Amino acid sequence: MRIHSSFVALCSFQATFAVASTAWPWQTFKSSPHEPPSLKVSKSGPVSPGYLFFDQSWDAHQYSVFIMSDNNELVWQSPPGDLKGFRVQQLDGNPVLTYFNGLGVPEPFGWGYGIIQVLDQSYSSIHNVSVINDNYTALGSINSSSFVSWIDMHENTMTSEGTMLVTGYNVTQCDLSSVGGPKDGWIADSLFYEIDVKTNDILYRWSAKDHLDQIPLEDVQPFYPVDDWGHNSSAPYGYFHINSVEKFQDGSYLISSRYYCSLFKIAKNGSVDWTLQGQTGGDFELKGIQWAYQHDGRIHHEQEDGFVLSIFDNANSDVSNGTHHTEGMLIHVNLATREASSLQTLHDPKDEIYAVSQGNTQLLPGGHAVMGYGSNPKIKEYSSNGTCVMTAQFGEDGVVASYRAYRSPWVGIPTTSPDLFACSDESNNKTQVFMSWNGATEHKKWKIFGGNTRGNLHPVSIVRKTGFETTASVVGGLKYVRVEADGFGIEKGVSKVVSVKEMC
């Protein structure tokens, strides 16, 4: 593995992205073309088991999603693309990977158009969750003729019923005169869907615009005023900005609106059951807590009279920022008394972050929590008492972004062949062998075979796997090499035969 840095890098996928100006280092390998970021990791206590799952964008060296270990070793890197919301979920009792794949529209808009891709443990794509035609109009400056799906990047939550909750943004006309905008104005309407993962059948659809009587435009003005927005389809007023969806046990939904600074319970008939607003409380009394511009509202420990809510409290946005640090919040929502009270807040006093966009809070089974900081490319893990025990950074603040970050156990069983590079160290009568297998987690050793003819190779060494790329020095000047991954349950870990390069 080599660590590199540069002041110029260019990434493209379905659109041309900005030239990177960051000097944040990345890794390179002899056997593999992948170039993940070099994680700067600090720990002050035990962390939970599992790998880190994250995406990177903005001026990142490579637009991809990554599985990496705490010790800065790559496990798997995807092909390049504008990919977001990368995590492990369950489908039919089996672990799968899910992420948005499409076109992200950067701030000040901050939404996207694409599919949710579902991969199995071999990293094969098994489902593309899509909304193909729902009378959408794209942002006026975007050519949507090649779009295959209109799903937005903000959500991809799998339910136990084999459905997925996703979001969408539709540019449409709306009367904005009540808040000082044009009567024939334009908005970015926020929608969410529940979709059958295997058939793409839409089982439920909700639109914020359809419920302006219960969620009026006037209520959002203190947090996201209309100003000059809404005069045309290229600058629609994105007043609601949906960014997460969860499902209650009774079949209703919990949705998060960034600019209303609110979470809403949406009944099965589409009406708004209640509003939990981060500054005023809405239909609840706030007991010593406040939040603003939150992301990632999640339901935990649901009971008849209440539940625990976790949110990523940005407390900052493009409208208002720099006055209060970002933190994770665990909130007890008492439905009987209509009170919301703090159970725990999560932030690192040694590294206060002001995340103006994106981010998430993941509660782990053992009591720890992981937070991805969105516009600030950091992942932090907190112990059960709220102490930060790990920070992993992969870019400069405000230069590289990551929509969400997670920690999860994962077993990867790729069906692709391992990658291999070999070169001659003639002066020392040795052959240098570099081997890797993108996504493989289960092999412990490498068997190396070599010889002077392609069809007559014999065992020359067995070496322990030492990371994403393992390097071995084999005595003798070989002409051809192949390797095999060795470990429990490994069936397809055989590389192609490669010729040994004359120079390393």
Model-derived features with residue positions:
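Histidine-/acidic-rich catalytic cores in large beta-rich domains
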Residues: 17-504
